[in-house]
From Swiss-Prot:
GO molecular function term, any single one: DNA binding
Reaction equation(s) it catalyzes: ATP + (deoxyribonucleotide)n-3'-hydroxyl + 5'-phospho-(deoxyribonucleotide)m = (deoxyribonucleotide)n+m + AMP + diphosphate
Cofactor field: Mg(2+)
Described function: DNA ligase that seals nicks in double-stranded DNA during DNA replication, DNA recombination and DNA repair.
Full protein name: Probable DNA ligase
Keywords from the UniProt entry: ATP-binding, Cell cycle, Cell division, DNA damage, DNA recombination, DNA repair, DNA replication, Ligase, Magnesium, Metal-binding, Nucleotide-binding
Active site per UniProt: K215 (n6-amp-lysine intermediate)
Keyword rRNA-binding among record annotations: no
Taxonomic path: Bacteria, Pseudomonadati, Myxococcota, Myxococcia, Myxococcales
Protein family: Belongs to the ATP-dependent DNA ligase family.
Pfam families found in the cross-reference section: DNA_ligase_A_C, DNA_ligase_A_M, DNA_ligase_A_N
Amino-acid positions noted as binding ATP in the UniProt annotation, renumbered to this chain: E213, R220, R235, E264, F304, R376, K382
Broad enzyme group: ligase
Length: 513
C-alpha cells in the first residue's frame, strides 16, 4: 500500500465525527494492507510508531519540514519503504548518527507530497489526532476480519497491544485470537481510571458503596511470579525487573508460588511521604547502576489488585474477590490503604488524609466489577486535587487530523520578574473546545511574530490562559528545569495582562512544596 493511501484514510477518519464511518474506512484500509504491512499499518492508524520513539525530536522534524522541497517528487512511497526508513533512523547510533537520521528523514520528505508529509510529521511527533482511538480501531479490525468485536478487544487486552491482534485476526481469524490469553510472565495492559470531580460524585456513579484506595504518586508496576521466576513490568509493559530488586524480593517471599499483582513502586522519604514523581522515576532509567542507586533511593511496593492468585486467573472476578485474594497473597504493609464506605463524609476524610500525606488522591472502585485490562473504564474513578496557574502563550503549533487549520498545541510560559521575560514550562493541546480553537487561532494569528506557514508560530506574549495540571516535574527540556504534568486549558483570562501571570518563583515553590 502507498503511504498516500494511508494518509488519505487518516484524513478522512479525522474529518468525520461519525464513529461508524470511521470504523468502515479503517476496516477497508486494514483489508487492503499486505500481510507484511498489517502490524505497522495498524500501529500507524492508531497514531503510534511500532517501536516507540526513534530518536528524532520535534525540532528536527520541523526543521526537516521547513527545508523540504515545495513539491515532493519521485515514485510514491510505500508503507514498507517508510517502515524500513524509520527502522534505519531508530537504529542509527554512534558518531554522526544525528546527521544520518536527518538525512533519512530529508530523503523521505523529499519523496512525499503534502498529505504524506503532514501524516509523517504528526506520527513522528505523536500528534496524529484523528479520533481513531483503540476502541474504534479494534472495532475496525473486527469488521475487517469478520469477527465479534468483543473477542478482538479481549485479545488486545491480553496482548497488551492491538497490532499483533490485528495481524492474527486478519491472517488466521478466530483461531488466531484464541492464542491470546493471560500467561504468568507476560504482561497485560493495566486497567485505568476515569476522573470524578469529587468523592461524592464517585460514590454516586458507583452505586453508593465503593472501595476507596490511595492514589500513589509512584510508578505503576505489574509483578509476575511463577515459582522461582519473577518478572516486573512497567505501565508501558517494559520489563523493569532488573531495576526493582526490592519488588523481586517481595514476590519471592510471598506464600503463593504463582502470582500476577498490580500496584505501584514509590520512593519514600524518612517521614513516609513520597518523593517527587521524577525522583522515583530515577530508578527506572534505561542506563542504570541499580547497585549504586538502590541504597540511596530505595523503592517501596504497594499492591492494589490480584490478577492471578490462589491458583486461579481472576480477571473476570469481582473486585471484592480479587482484593480478598490480594489480602491472602501479601501482608497489609504491602497493600495500599483502603476504605470501603458509602458515607461521603468518611470518603472525604479519607481523601484529605491521602492528600495530607503527599499522595495524589484516591481511586474509587466498584466492588462487583471485573478487571478490565487496557480499558479506562467507569468502574474505577480517580479523585485528585488539580492545581491551576495563569500562564502566557509563547507560541502555538498547527494541528493535524480534525484540528488541521487551527493553531492547537500551545507553548506555555511563566513570568520571570528578574528578566521581564517568560520561562517555558511545557505544551498542551488538551481541554480546548472547537469554539476555543477557532477563537485562539484568529487571536494568535494576529499576535504572530513569525511566518504563519511554519509548523510552529511564535507570538507576542500577550494572551493569558488558566491551565490546570496534576503536578510539576524536573525537566532538562525547558530552560527553567521544570515542566507541568498533564497540563490542560481551562479558560482564557482576557481580564488579565501578561504582567499578572504567575511567576517562575511560584512554580518553583509548588515544586518544592
Amino acid at each position: 500500500m502507498l503511504l498516500a493511501e494511508l494518509a488519505e484514510v487518516s484524513r478522512a477518519v479525522a474529518a468525520t465525527p461519525a464513529r461508524l464511518e470511521k470504523i468502515a474506512r479503517l476496516a477497508e484500509a486494514l483489508r487492503r494492507l499486505a500481510p507484511d504491512e498489517r502490524a505497522v499499518g495498524a500501529s500507524w492508524l492508531a497514531g503510534d510508531l511500532p517501536g516507540g520513539r526513534i530518536g528524532i525530536g520535534g525540532a528536527t522534524v520541523r526543521a526537516a519540514l521547513d527545508a523540504a522541497p515545495a513539491e515532493g517528487g519521485g515514485p510514491g512511497l510505500t508503507v514498507a519503504e517508510v517502515d524500513a526508513a524509520l527502522g534505519r533512523i531508530a537504529t542509527a547510533s554512534g558518531a554522526g548518527s544525528a546527521g544520518a537520521r536527518r538525512r533519512e528523514l530529508d530523503a523521505l520528505l523529499a519523496r512525499a507530497g503534502a498529505p504524506e508529509r503532514w501524516f509523517l510529521a504528526a506520527l513522528l511527533l505523536g500528534e496524529l489526532r484523528q479520533g481513531a482511538l483503540e476502541g474504534v480501531l479494534a472495532d475496525a479490525v473486527a469488521r475487517a476480519a469478520g469477527l465479534p468485536a468483543a473477542e478482538v478487544r479481549r485479545a488486545a487486552m491480553l496482548a497488551g497491544a492491538l497490532p499483533p491482534v490485528a495481524v492474527a485476526a486478519l491472517s488466521e481469524g478466530a483461531a488466531g485470537l484464541a492464542r491470546f490469553r493471560l500467561r504468568v510472565g507476560e504482561p497485560v495492559s493495566p486497567m485505568l481510571a476515569q476522573t470524578a470531580a469529587d468523592v461524592e460524585e464517585a460514590l454516586r456513579a458507583l452505586g453508593g458503596e465503593a472501595a476507596l484506595e490511595w492514589k500513589l504518586d509512584g510508578a505503576r508496576i505489574q509483578a509476575h511470579r511463577d515459582g522461582g521466576e519473577v518478572r516486573v513490568f512497567s505501565r508501558s509493559l517494559r520489563d523493569v525487573t532488573a531495576a526493582v530488586p526490592e519488588v523481586v524480593a517481595l514476590l519471592r517471599a510471598a506464600p503463593e508460588p504463582r502470582l500476577v499483582l498490580d500496584g505501584e513502586a514509590i520512593a519514600l522519604r524518612a517521614d513516609g511521604t513520597p518523593e517527587p514523581f521524577q525522583v522515583t522515576m530515577r530508578r527506572f532509567g534505561r542506563r542504570l547502576d541499580v547497585e549504586r542507586l538502590a541504597p540511596d533511593l530505595p523503592l517501596t511496593a504497594f499492591f492494589f489488585d490480584a490478577l492471578v492468585a490462589g491458583g486461579a486467573e481472576l480477571l473476570a472476578s469481582p473486585e471484592r474477590v480479587r482484593w480478598a485474594a490480594l489480602e491472602r497473597a501479601v501482608p497489609a504493609e504491602q497493600r495500599v490503604p483502603r476504605l470501603v464506605t458509602r458515607d461521603p463524609a468518611e470518603a472525604g476524610a479519607f481523601l484529605e488524609d491521602a492528600l495530607a500525606r503527599g499522595q495524589e488522591g484516591v481511586v474509587a472502585k466498584a466492588l462487583d466489577a471485573p478487571y478490565e485490562a487496557g480499558r479506562r473504564g467507569a468502574a474505577w474513578l480517580k479523585v485528585k486535587r488539580a492545581h491551576t496557574l495563569d500562564l502566557v502563550v509563547l507560541a502555538a503549533e498547527w494541528g493535524s487530523g480534525r484540528r488541521r487549520g487551527w493553531l492547537s498545541n500551545l507553548h506555555l510560559g511563566a513570568r520571570d520578574p528578574s528578566t521581564g521575560g517568560f520561562v517555558m514550562l511545557g505544551k498542551t493541546f488538551k481541554g480546548m473546545t472547537d469554539a476555543m480553537l477557532a477563537w485562539q487561532t484568529e487571536r494568535l494569528k494576529a499576535l504572530a511574530t513569525g511566518p504563519l506557514d511554519a509548523w510552529q508560530v511564535p507570538v507576542r506574549p500577550e494572551l493569558v490562559v488558566e491551565v490546570a495540571f496534576d503536578g510539576i516535574q524536573s525537566s532538562p527540556r525547558y530552560p527553567g528545569g521544570l515542566a507541568l504534568r498533564f497540563a490542560r486549558v481551562k479558560r482564557y483570562r482576557e481580564d488579565k495582562r501578561p504582567e499578572d501571570a504567575d511567576t517562575i518563583e511560584t512554580v518553583r515553590g509548588l515544586y518544592g512544596g
